[in-house]
Each structure stands twice: as structure tokens, then as C-alpha cells.
Amino acid sequence: MAVCMPKVRVFVDTNVIIESFRTGCWTAICEHFAIETVEKCIEEAMTGDRTDPRYVSVDAEVLNAGLAARHAVGKIDVATLVLEFPHAQGLDDGELHLLAYLRGEGVSEDIPIMLSTADKAAVVLAGQLGWLDFLICLESLVERSGVTRGQVVALAGHYRARWLDEVRVKIRLGVIP
């Protein structure tokens, strides 16, 4: 009898949601991983300038059906993060709320989660929080989810392992403070 392993919890930001819809990978990653996010990332993914040629339509029903959980973030969690890391104010609201939520939950090596973001400032802050090893790129998620090679190739550069690896190395070497 096969033992069903629990899905790995992966917290995603707005950009990862939008890129996974653009490339048609959302459902596949949600079937393979327990995808979670915060309300602000959902709000951001559902809005945008529809006249922008780069606009990506995100189907609310499909988005919500794929999520294992969506989390509200309190003002105290956001304020606490910004007070401890003032440069966090420079993050987009979705990434700020996502990192504030995770910090408020006490994420540590004892809690097995992954974080997927393609925002360099969010990666830097994740590093300062001691979470560099929790980061996973969208490319790795989709490759493990059985999508087509065409969907993987369609991912923009900052959703790929090479980009994330380069940023992590620069952070570890102190090139990016």
C-alpha cells in the first residue's frame, strides 16, 4: 500500500502567481505542492492595467481553487517587520505582507516551507531573515510538477534557477548587502 506524503508548503508572491497563469502552470504546481499566499498577493494578482499589453488575466476561481490556504496579515506583523528592517518599506505590498506573515508565524528551519518570489528586494530581505535556503524558483516548481518543456521555456529569466542562484551567491558574498 502506497503511503501518501504530505505536499510541501510553498508560499508564493504576486509575481509568481501571475507568471504561473501566463505560462499555464498554475494548476500543475497546485496539484503537486500546497500553494499558499496572503490576501494582498491575491488582491494584486487580480488587479492591474488591462490596457497594458503585458497584462495577464488571472481567473479568480482558478486561483482560489488551487490555493491550499490564503492568509490575512495583520498591521502589527507588517509594522514589526518594517521597524526591524526599515528597507522593507521598499517592497511591493504583496511581498511585504507575505514576508511579514511568514515572520509573524515564526518560520524557521524547524518548519518545512518553501518561498517563491522573483523580486530581488524580497530575496534580499529573505536572506536577512535567514531564509535563503527556503527560496525556490518557479522554474523548479514547474519542472517538478510535470508541465511541458514549452511551459518551462516560456518562463521569464527572473523565475529561473540561474537568476535565483546568482542573487543568493551575491547575498552570501556580501555583494548585495
Can you describe what each PLM-predicted range is?
Residues 117-119:
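Short beta-strand/turn micro-motifs composed of small residues
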Residues 2-114, 123-124, 128-129, 136-149, ...:
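Active-site-proximal, substrate-binding regions of enzyme catalytic domains
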